[in-house]
Design a protein with these regions (language model features):
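Conserved small/polar residues in nucleotide/adenosyl-binding loops
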Residues: 195-201
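Short juxtamembrane and helix-loop transition motifs at transmembrane-helix boundaries
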Residues: 1, 57-62, 88
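A feature for the membrane-embedded catalytic helix bundles of lipid/isoprenoid biosynthetic enzymes
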Residues: 2-22, 36-40, 69-194
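Short, hydrophobic transmembrane alpha-helix segments
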Residues: 22-30
């Protein structure tokens, strides 16, 4: 049972999403607070399930499949909701589009490479990018309450959240390019290896 905990946490993160959406649209302080708590819980389980899987040596196929899907669903849902309600607006929407586009492209790349049994390891910068995304979204979800708690001169929770969103978008571009380059290199090397194996050798008469 203990070995199944990482997968249970991952599935739980997906189950949280509809409740997060519902809480986001609840009016007032408690709606904001509930949405924030659900997002923070989902973000924490992302860290926790990976850590437990490595500690137990139980990085299952199901976990490998569902974990990145769960991450992308919660982040994409939060960003779309924040754009729709105007928290992320004007040029700030570009940062959200960059993040969402990168996630779609890299997911497709991973799926393509998986057919050739090629894995792209998660880089340290990609992990930092994920942390910045989660923190920025949490700050933006905190609303007016967050602004009252975090307020340093011209910098409140919303302002800091937007700054971190742009930073995560910049890292998203960099890590996305890095993944695409590595993925193409892997695919090309596999194609060359396959060609060498399948092409008939020329006989010398």
């Amino acid at each position: 049972m203990l070995k199944k905990i990482p997968n249970i946490l991952t599935i739980g993160r997906i189950i949280i999403v509809p409740f997060f959406v519902l809480a986001f649209y609840l009016p007032g302080f408690y709606g904001d607070l509930t949405a924030l708590i659900l997002f923070v819980v989902a973000s924490f389980t992302d860290f926790l399930d990976g850590m437990l899987a490595r500690m137990m040596g139980e990085e299952s196929k199901l976990g490998e499949l569902l974990d990145p899907i769960a991450d992308k669903i919660i982040v994409a849902t939060a960003l779309i909701l924040l754009v729709m309600d105007g928290t992320i607006r004007n040029y700030e929407v570009i940062a959200a589009i960059i993040i969402l586009t990168r996630e779609i492209l890299i997911s497709g790349l991973r799926e393509f490479l998986a057919k050739g049994k090629i894995k792209l390891p998660v880089s340290s910068l990609a992990k930092l990018k994920t942390v910045l995304q989660m923190v920025s979204i949490a700050l933006l979800l905190s609303g007016d309450t967050g602004n009252k708690i975090i307020n340093f001169q011209d910098y409140n929770a919303q302002t800091i959240g937007i700054i971190l969103l742009w930073l995560s978008a910049a890292l998203t571009l960099f890590t996305g390019y890095d993944y695409m380059r590595k993925g193409i290199d892997h695919a090309m090397s596999e194609a060359v290896s396959y060609t060498h194996l399948t092409l008939p050798t020329k006989r010398i008469v």
